[in-house]
Curated annotation (Swiss-Prot):
Superkingdom, taxonomy of origin: Bacteria
GO CC terms: peptidoglycan-based cell wall; plasma membrane
Protein name in UniProt: Uncharacterized protein Rv2100
SMART domains: HNHc
Keyword Signal: yes
């Protein structure tokens, strides 16, 4: 599924709206122009000369650079706001699953090398420049930092009445600079005090505990093969989970080398794999606990792509258990020695940079790989397709799809890191003109697959080694390489060079009918969410508006 559909006129004027209010734009840019001209006359010291500066000069340089950085951030957001205004607008495609907003977010994401979601967040933040022109003027002049502006934009997001927003903008612009160095919670309280004065129904109540239920998984730690986990649950669910993890942790024999905390953590992984018990780690065939099968490993498929010797690695005995005893401190111990971490009991074995990549893109070190193999993980050898002929159908075979996913590891759009497992296999040159061949196939998440298929502004060219060269609607080009190149530099992924394909006319009307549709347009969804969150203040407003009791 690849091709071209609509070529929107990106140069067309945006309908009247926040981004096209001449008064707002004049206020923001005129105030900023004089301030920025003065600011950039600051003589910032050369980094090589800082060693000759006194402490006062160093602190002054830090402050000046912070102002310049804030002004630059404001200008970056101004450019994002302008681009958003040019790309979005009322259109018959507003109910498309991949709409004009997504088109703009794709350009921002590629330019900043960030994810689609983060780019969309930057776009929402940029719109606050015109919602709050007086605050924006301070930001553009470097008098407010990006952190403070972001908090103001978030806390005032529910204010939609123009008069209340104007009063709030003036009040925040007058007082924000005098708040000084406050923590985020204190800044929120200071901002909320003004919102409560001018539009109490717009107070953010989304931090109510029940509404903040979430479970987050952090970025993998490539050295340790672990990832952070945090979140908020209903108290009853948390109690059940806590009790269940403890029960599973105590279900192993006394010879299990792991601590109780480590067993509880492993028990959560076992629950995720659908197990009702935690496999014992004693390694004894006659373990009295009878919990020998590790369901966590049974749910893992190891794709061998380069060096099969990694499969022979041995489990690390020091991955579990208590920390080794620290070296004793003596009167002769130096401060440097006291602060230096204790060495590991045994030096870790040297392995290739990466032997296993998880679906989330994290690296699993060889010792952990050995643990998974010992627990019964499935091993699959990825076959290189070589110079085989193209497959005669649209959908690639399982083996070909496996090669493409292992080669790419993630979505190939610039800045996107959706794991290949959850991506579509996209024909770079549209089928049937483009063959089902590894030199013409890549991973694309559903959002970017739709973007490329239904919007002709984006074009891509794929090279035999898997390199993809993207061209944005604005003419900028971005080159992405297969993710395996980073982790498996010796794996030869180059396949046959394909003849150049010709382009044919696309039946725009017919293909447009295939675009998935939204239940509500983005604008309608935004209005629904704002109204729903404002409704959380109804009880507060009713109590606040009660007449005096006398």
């Amino acid at each position: 599924m690849a091709g071209a559909l609509f070529e929107p006129s990106f140069a067309a004027a945006h309908p009247a709206g926040l981004l096209r209010r001449p008064v707002t734009r004049t206020v923001v840019l005129s105030v900023a122009a004089t301030s920025i001209a003065h600011m950039f006359e600051i003589s910032l010291p050369d980094p090589t000369e800082l060693c000759r500066s006194d402490d006062g000069a160093l602190v002054a340089a830090i402050e000046d650079c912070a102002r310049v950085e804030a002004a630059a951030s404001a200008r970056r957001l101004s450019a994002i706001a302008e681009l958003t205004g040019r790309r979005t607008g009322a259109d018959q495609r507003a109910d498309w699953a991949c709409d004009f907003w997504d088109c703009a977010a794709a350009e921002v994401a590629a330019a900043l090398t960030i994810s689609h979601g983060k780019a969309s967040g930057q776009m929402h933040l940029s719109l606050a420049l015109n919602r709050l022109p007086q605050v924006a003027a301070l930001f553009l002049a470097g008098h407010l930092g990006a952190r403070l502006f972001s908090i103001i934009a978030w806390r005032t997001y529910l204010v939609r009445d123009p008069h209340a927003l104007s009063l709030l903008d003036a009040a925040l612009a007058e007082h924000a600079g005098a708040w000084g160095p406050l923590s985020a919670p204190k800044l929120e309280k200071a901002i909320d005090s003004w919102i409560d004065r001018y539009d109490p129904g717009a107070l953010r109540r989304s931090r109510i505990s029940a509404r903040t239920r979430d479970l987050c998984i952090g970025d993998p730690d490539e050295d340790a093969g672990t990832a952070a986990l945090w979140g908020r649950l209903y108290a009853t669910d948390a109690a059940m989970l806590d009790r269940r993890l403890t029960e599973m942790a105590h279900g192993v024999c006394e010879d299990d080398p792991r601590t109780l905390a480590q067993r509880r953590a492993d028990a959560l992984g076992a629950l995720a794999a659908g197990a009702d018990h935690l496999a014992c780690g004693c390694g004894k065939p006659d373990c009295p606990s009878g919990a020998g099968n590790d369901e966590r490993a049974a749910g893992v498929v190891i794709h061998v792509v380069a060096d099969a010797s990694a499969l022979d690695a041995q489990p690390d005995p020091h991955l579990s258990g208590d920390e080794p005893p620290s070296r004793p401190l003596t009167p002769e111990t130096t401060l440097f020695e006291a602060l230096t971490p204790d060495p590991e009991p045994d030096p870790p074995a040297t392995h290739a940079p990466a032997e296993l990549i998880t679906t989330g893109g994290g690296v699993v070190p060889a010792p952990l790989l050995a643990e998974l193999i010992r627990g019964g993980a499935t091993i699959s050898q990825v076959r290189h397709p070589g110079d085989l002929a193209a497959e005669p159908h649209y959908r690639p075979s399982a083996k070909l799809a496996e090669f493409v996913r292992m080669r790419d590891l993630t979505c190939r759009f610039p800045g996107c890191d959706v794991p290949a497992e959850f991506c579509d296999i996209d024909h770079s040159a549209p089928w049937p003109l483009g063959p089902t061949h590894p030199s013409n196939l890549k991973c694309a998440c559903r959002k970017h697959h739709l973007l490329k298929t239904f919007w002709t502004g984006w074009r891509d060219v794929q090279l035999p080694d898997g390199t993809v060269i993207w061209t944005a609607p604005n003419g900028h080009t971005y080159t992405t390489h297969p993710g395996s190149r980073i982790f498996f530099p010796t794996w030869h992924t180059t396949t046959a060079e394909l003849p150049q394909t010709s382009t044919a006319a696309v039946n725009v009307d017919a293909r447009g009918l295939m675009m998935p549709r939204r239940r509500r347009t983005r604008a309608a969804e935004l209005a629904h969410r704002i109204n729903a969150e404002r409704a959380l203040n109804d009880a507060y407003m009713a109590e606040r508006n009660k007449p005096p009791s006398f």
